[in-house]
Swiss-Prot record:
Coiled coil: none annotated. It comes from Mus musculus. The chain crosses the membrane at residues 833-853. This is Prostaglandin F2 receptor negative regulator. A motif (Cell attachment site) lies at residues 89-91, 703-705. InterPro entries: Ig-like_dom, Ig-like_dom_sf, Ig-like_fold, Ig_sub, Ig_V-set, IgSF_V-set/TM_domain. Glycans are attached at residues 44, 300, 383, 413, 525, 600, 618, 691. Interacts with CD9 and CD81. Part of a complex composed of CD9, CD81 and IGSF8. Also seems to interact with CD63, CD82 and CD151. Expressed in myoblasts (at protein level). The keyword rRNA-binding does not apply.
Length: 879
């Protein structure tokens, strides 16, 4: 058996569910209102069924026994005839605040409205539960509140700023109930009104916005006088205090444990007019003072205030004549406590209470401008406070500072004039005939350059360098880099002498130069201000510009010689319009006209620079490293020798001479370059002529086969002994169908039998051998697809001369032969086919084995019944 449920708890829940129902509520307790005010009674309903919007009926009873219909939200004919006229006028109305709430408004409550008011709601519930009406009692009191000014009509007060004033308001009540009064002072200026100070019904003071500081300082106070007078006291009137003052009094009573305002009255007490304080300032219109003297400016004050006001005087300085303080500088200030705030050279004092003097000592030109006097009058307030009652700005006083500028002349001369390019130039700028050049004046210089034009076109000057008053030297764009490199030097020898030196004058430096000497005056803050500029007359830097001339003549002492002899050539140099020249020589060689081996090719052999340092250029004959000599015979003559000349040395030989001019120190400048006449080396011989050709029995091979290429040399003309001939053979290949790519070196064999093989990126290899005296065999082993292309050989013959020396002949080239490498289809597909057939056979056998195993072990069914038992089963079914 289970435990029985707790019966008391169930009964309590059931009772709560049964008791719950509609609840209509109006304010509890008694509502108290004053005759002539508005009565508002709220009513709401909760815990109801039916539509969300509920209707309300109001009834009134003066005694609480019988009620008269007053108003309804849903039935037009509900009100009694007694109240219909007031409903039509709007004195009585219902205002819905929510679907379940409504307010009854009765304007201008009368004593006859005192009684009981009942709020009821028609039923929309399924069952009648709860309360459908609620009643509240209203008491209407007579108007017992009396509010008024202390005098009628309201007075008009005319005050000056800073003067005190008082205003009084009479407020009292004879209400039979316990009520409190609250009072608030307001200031009205047109449509704007401000709360000044309020006394709440609980006896607390509340200053209005903007009056907090004045209230806490005691400047604005509120107190009572007697039993019914409230006094507003202002210790110091401000311009913002002008306007109409009203006294607002409200009466409060406690309802339902809280205070409720039951009526409010306001009365105009007084109109206050604040007269502005008259303040005028007078300063001198214009003042002229000599530089170095003292400036004295007066500011005279005129005002109608005779009470205890204190002036605050401030002097400002600015460069423009307007009266705004923008871009102005404060010079001195005398505060209301007579304390002066100024810089050391400025003083501010007052002769009497209405005249203030500004003294600026030792004025300079920077003190020229406009001076303004700003005066503010301060009146004492409550609790030792001060407030500003007037402020005025004077008209600007124009001050001009005259200066006796120094007098001097500037003279510019050229102490060094260049005769050639790269010569130095030196200019001297001197200051002469100085007058009134005091100790506080400093002289600086600026250098300018102007290009010389043959016509009358105006050319702008270019700044070279400028010196500031603090001796800082700044370079112009034209001279900045050269000055940093030390080519331009600016110096100051004496206080009146400035120098400008160009270490190496170029043709671009030709033109007019002039200097500008500036006078600078020291200011009080130790800064310097430019006061005067004096220009010198220009000095023209120019020299006759003639083109440099360099002539080189080459000659051959021995005009005819044979191969193996020594070749000698001398070069004579002459120059003009080149300063202190030194020469560098370069020997060049060109193939003679008609030589097709390397046409128009100039070869640099050996050189000698201006410091007589010899250098081999493109001399590549390793067997004759010491076979060429270049030496300096005289300052303008050079000799070139070539020992053991060969036939391949035939050509045109020249001397390329460059003249160098010193530019200072160990630096040189290239002045001119010239090429001598050619000296030809021509061997008058009837030697053999060599030709080269390429032959192959296998121009088309299958990949992997051997490629054989023969380079055959033929000799025409004179018959030579095989021991007197040797060859350098090189094989090249162009791996393309055309000759549009660069040739690749395959292998080379020099005349001494040394073989060199080029680097290859695939598996095939090459070999080169000499088959006979005039045949050379190139073999490509294990040919690949990349080995196709054009093949040719290059042959350099060497012939032994009668003197026993070997002479190098011109290099010859064979015509190319095209080699094709084909693919072997059978070999290419043999191994893939064998692999495919093998894999197919293995996969087929594996499939058969898997099928057999599956059918034997996995798919066989086990039969337990015998044939005889099956027959018996069939017999039973048939029976």
């Amino acid at each position: 058996m289970g435990r029985p449920a707790p019966r008391p708890l169930l009964l309590a829940l059931l009772s709560l569910a049964v008791c719950r129902g509609r609840v209509v509520r109006v304010p509890a307790g008694t509502l108290v209102r004053v005759v002539g005010t508005e009565l508002v009674i709220p009513c709401n309903v909760s815990d109801y069924d039916g539509p969300s919007e509920q209707n309300f009926d109001w009834s009134f009873s003066s005694s609480g026994s019988s009620f008269v219909e007053l108003a309804s939200t849903w039935e037009v004919g509900f009100p009694a005839q007694l109240y219909r006229e007031r409903l039509q006028r709007g004195d009585i109305l219902l205002r819905r605040t929510a679907n379940d709430a409504v307010e009854l408004h009765i304007k201008n409550v009368q004593p006859s409205d005192q009684g009981h008011y009942k709020c009821s709601t028609p039923s929309t519930d399924a069952t009648v539960q709860g309360n459908y009406e609620d009643t509240v009692q209203v008491k209407v009191l007579a108007d017992a509140l009396v509010v008024g000014p202390s005098s009628r009509p309201p007075p008009g007060l005319s005050l000056r700023e800073g003067e005190p004033f008082e205003l009084r308001c009479i407020a009292s009540t004879t209400s039979p109930l316990h009520t409190h009064l609250a009072l608030r002072w307001e200031l009205h200026r047109g449509p704007v009104h401000r709360s000044i100070l309020a006394l709440s019904h609980e006896g607390r003071f509340h200053p209005g916005p903007g009056y907090e500081q004045r209230y806490h300082s005691g400047d604005v106070r509120l107190d009572t006088v007697g039993s019914d007078a409230y006094r507003l006291s202002v210790a110091r009137a401000l311009s913002a205090d002008q306007g109409s003052y009203r006294c607002v009094v409200s009466e409060w009573i406690t309802e339902q444990g809280s205070w409720q305002e039951i009526q409010e009255k306001a009365v105009e007490v007084a109109t206050v007019v604040i007269q502005p304080t008259a303040l005028q300032l007078a300063v001198p219109r214009t003042v002229s003072v000599t530089e170095g003297k003292d400036l004295d400016l007066s500011c005279n004050i005129t005002t109608d205030r005779v009470d205890d006001v204190r002036p605050e005087v401030t002097w400002y300085f600015k460069k423009t004549p307007d009266t705004s303080l923008l871009a102005s500088h404060m010079l001195a200030r005398l505060d209301r406590d007579s304390l002066v705030h100024s810089s050391p050279h400025v003083a501010l004092s007052h002769v009497d209470t209405r005249s203030y003097h500004l003294l600026v000592r030792d004025v300079s030109k920077e003190n020229s401008g406009y001076y303004l006097c700003l005066v503010a009058l301060w009146a004492p307030g409550h609790n030792r406070s001060w407030h500003k009652v007037a402020e005025a700005m004077s008209a600007p006083s124009g001050v001009s500072v005259t200066w006796l500028e120094p007098e001097y002349q500037v003279y510019l001369n050229a102490s060094k004039v260049p005769g050639f390019s790269d010569d130095p130039t030196e200019l001297q700028c001197r200051v002469i005939d100085t007058k009134r050049l005091e100790a506080g004046v400093r002289l600086t210089v600026s250098w300018y350059y102007r290009m010389t034009r043959r016509n009358d076109d105006v050319v702008a000057s270019e700044l070279l360098a400028v010196m500031d008053g603090d001796w800082t030297l700044r370079y112009g764009e034209r001279s900045k880099q050269r000055a940093q490199d030390g080519e331009f030097i600016f110096s100051k020898e004496h206080t009146d002498t400035f120098n400008f030196r160009i270490q190496r004058t170029t043709e671009e430096d030709r033109g007019n130069y002039y200097c500008v000497v500036s006078a600078w005056t020291r200011q009080r803050n130790n800064s310097w201000v430019k006061s005067k500029d004096v220009f010198s007359k220009p000095v023209n830097i120019f020299w006759a510009s003639e083109d440099s001339v360099l002539v080189v003549k080459a000659r051959q002492p021995k005009p005819f010689f044979a191969a193996g002899n020594t070749f000698e050539m001398t070069c004579k140099v002459s120059s003009k319009n080149i300063k202190s020249p030194r020469y560098s020589v370069l020997i060049t060689a060109e193939k003679p006209v008609g030589d097709l081996s390397s046409p128009n090719e100039t070869k640099y052999i050996i050189s000698l620079d201006q410091d007589s340092v010899v250098k081999l250029e493109n001399w590549t004959d390793a067997s004759r490293v010491d076979g060429v000599v270049l030496e300096k015979v005289q300052e303008d003559e050079f000799r070139y020798r070539m020992y053991q000349t060969q036939v391949s040395d035939a050509g045109l030989y020249r001397c390329m001479v460059t003249a160098w001019s010193p530019i200072g120190g160990s630096l040189w400048r290239e002045a001119a370059t010239s090429l001598s006449n050619p000296i030809e080396i021509d061997f008058q011989t009837s030697g053999p002529t060599f030709n080269a050709s390429v032959h192959s029995d296998t121009p088309s091979v299958t990949r992997g086969d051997l490629i054989k290429l023969f380079c055959i040399v033929t000799v025409e003309g004179a018959v030579l002994d095989p021991d007197d001939m040797a060859f350098d053979v090189s094989w090249f290949a162009v791996h393309s169908f055309g000759l549009d790519k660069a040739p690749v070196l395959l292998s080379s064999l020099d005349r001494k039998g040394v073989v060199t093989t080029g680097q290859r990126d695939w598996k095939s290899t090459v070999s080169l051998e000499r088959v006979s005296v005039l045949e050379f065999l190139l073999q490509v082993h294990g040919s690949e697809d990349q080995d196709f292309g054009n093949y040719y050989c290059s042959v350099t013959p060497w012939v032994r001369s009668p003197t026993g020396s070997w002479q190098r002949e011109a290099e010859i080239h064979s015509r190319p032969i095209f080699i094709t490498v084909k693919m072997d289809v059978l070999n290419a597909f043999k191994y893939p086919l064998l692999i495919g057939v093998g894999l197919s056979t293995v996969i087929g056998l594996l499939s058969c084995l898997i099928g057999y195993c599956s059918s034997h072990w996995c798919c066989k069914k086990e039969v337990r019944e015998t044939r005889r038992e099956r027959r018996r089963l069939m017999s039973m079914e048939m029976d």
